[in-house]
């Protein structure tokens, strides 16, 4: 269970970094006044909730419930209503938010406008797919210690564990 929690935490952290501009834009639409500096943890909690609502395959009610419960753990009970209201609003407005993001590529793809301009100029047909791919989780890479294993045998053991693999093309390890 610890390794599952660690993997989930890692996925959330990387996802927040990848999609920060988008998540921040969405969260600020539903927060009427800026949070105090000492309440950055609540802002982060909201960002995590928004990320999970948009990008993770978890039930919405569980995301919202856990986010609200975390306010108590942070000893900020006052924030429960805020976190609940923001995340429920995001949940309700998901379709309109997605449509709005489609008109704001620098926010949708979390890329600066200058980079989008360069990509658009150099790859007019492919710039959107390039930005989408920039935001994808990187593939896992394994290096086989050839002193202990043969590459083909290791791939075979991965396949037996129902893990798809392919040999790299840059090195033979």
Regions from the PLM with identified roles:
Residues 1-173:
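Class I Rossmann-like S-adenosyl-L-methionine
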